[in-house]
Swiss-Prot record:
InterPro entries: ATPase_NBD, Bacterial_glucokinase, Glucokinase. GO terms for cellular component: cytosol. It is an enzyme of class 2 (transferase). It comes from Nitrobacter hamburgensis (strain DSM 10229 / NCIMB 13809 / X14). Keywords: ATP-binding, Cytoplasm, Glycolysis, Kinase, Nucleotide-binding, Plasmid, Transferase. SUPFAM superfamilies: Actin-like ATPase domain (SSF53067). The gene is glk. It catalyses: D-glucose + ATP = D-glucose 6-phosphate + ADP + H(+). One of its GO terms (biological process) is glycolytic process. NCBIfam families: glk, PRK12408.1. The keyword Membrane does not apply. One of its GO terms (molecular function) is D-glucose binding. It is found in: Cytoplasm. This is Glucokinase. The lineage of its organism: Bacteria, Pseudomonadati, Pseudomonadota, Alphaproteobacteria, Hyphomicrobiales. ATP binds at G12, D13, I14, G15, G16, T17.
Length: 320
């Protein structure tokens, strides 16, 4: 017997390099494919090709997409990709009955309630989980920040642009780094330090402070040298990265009252979970003076699921 088309949804996580599409049913997904976005002129071409290749009984009429960039109306423009589209027009072009488009990090945040325990790696002493708001923060291409609030058995997503809030230095050494960064950007956002490019910015700022010429490094170069211990400045850059992420995560926990925990997503730290666990992140997270005991009770967990945005989209409430 064929599957119910109303039970199926096509889901897609559209990044700057790849578009990942899958078919979701009852919170799980299958038929995963990675398509290189450089091969397509528009999103409708990539998604249309994916749908056309599916067996007839697996072609959904409903969809949910996650895109890198703000979603506040019908017209959507991706941040790191020369694609833009109308949600209404895309829905019509593909003959879909419903189509929901959300920010990619919002979709990642929506995955948290559905993550198995094995995909939640504790950073710091394990804490018993309690009910309450959940914060999600993720350094990657940018810095994603979202929150989830429980309400009568469901979760309400609070998306935002917290990665563009002001970067808060917590030590004199960090203040010097921020001063160097301010010579490049009048407003130094958290994302300027807590992202892939931000890690390079930290390395270059430290080189400036140390009076040496920086090597032309990529984010992967910085982390590779840091993990091997072959470059003291890269080691310091990774340490500062983890420390400042702890400060920002602690601020998020206090702001939303994240008694349900703070979850960290993003590919940067996923590859170095042991080094991250032994970094100053957790100490800095708790270092909030009178509220240290409050933060000590809040768990911080690294998301190990490789495609959390797809898991979130698979469970995103859709119009009937």
């Amino acid at each position: 017997m064929g599957k119910s088309m109303t039970a199926l949804r096509v889901i897609g996580d559209i990044g700057g390099t790849y578009a990942r599409f899958a078919v979701a049913e009852r919170g799980k997904y299958s038929e995963l494919q990675h398509l290189s976005v450089s091969k397509y002129a528009a999103l409708k071409d990539a998604l249309g090709e994916y749908l056309a290749a599916l067996p007839r009984d697996l072609r959904p009429t409903r969809g949910a997409l996650a895109v890198a960039g703000p979603v506040s109306g019908d017209e959507v423009k991706l941040t790191n990709l020369n694609w833009s589209f109308s949600i209404t027009a895309l829905k019509a072009d593909l003959g879909m009955s419903s189509l929901v488009v959300v920010n990619d990090f919002a979709a990642t945040a929506m995955s948290v309630p559905y993550l198995p325990e094995a995909d939640c790696y504790p950073i710091g002493p394990p804490q018993s989980k309690t009910s309450g708001p959940v914060g999600v923060i993720g350094p990657g291409t940018g810095l994603g920040v979202s929150a989830l609030v429980p309400d009568a058995g469901r979760w309400i997503l609070l998306p935002g642009e917290g990665g563009h809030s002001t970067l808060p230095p917590a030590t004199q050494a960090e203040s010097l780094i921020v001063e160097v960064l301010r010579t490049h950007w009048p407003h130094v956002s958290a994302e300027r330090a807590l992202s892939g490019a931000g890690l390079v910015n930290l390395y270059q700022a430290l080189c400036s402070i140390e009076g040496k010429r920086p090597d032309p490094l990529s984010p992967a170069d910085v982390t590779d040298r840091a993990m091997r211990g072959s470059d003291p400045t890269c080691v310091k850059a990774f340490e500062v990265f983890c420390s400042m992420l702890g400060t920002v995560a602690g601020d998020l926990a206090l702001t939303i009252g994240a008694t349900g925990g703070i979850y960290i997503a993003g590919g940067i730290l996923l590859r170095f979970k042991e080094a991250f666990a032994s970094s100053p992140f957790r100490d800095r997270f708790e270092d909030k003076g009178r509220f240290q005991d409050y933060l000590r009770r809040i768990p911080t967990l690294l998301i190990l699921e490789e495609s959390p945005a797809l898991l979130g989209l698979a469970n995103l409430p859709l119009e009937p």
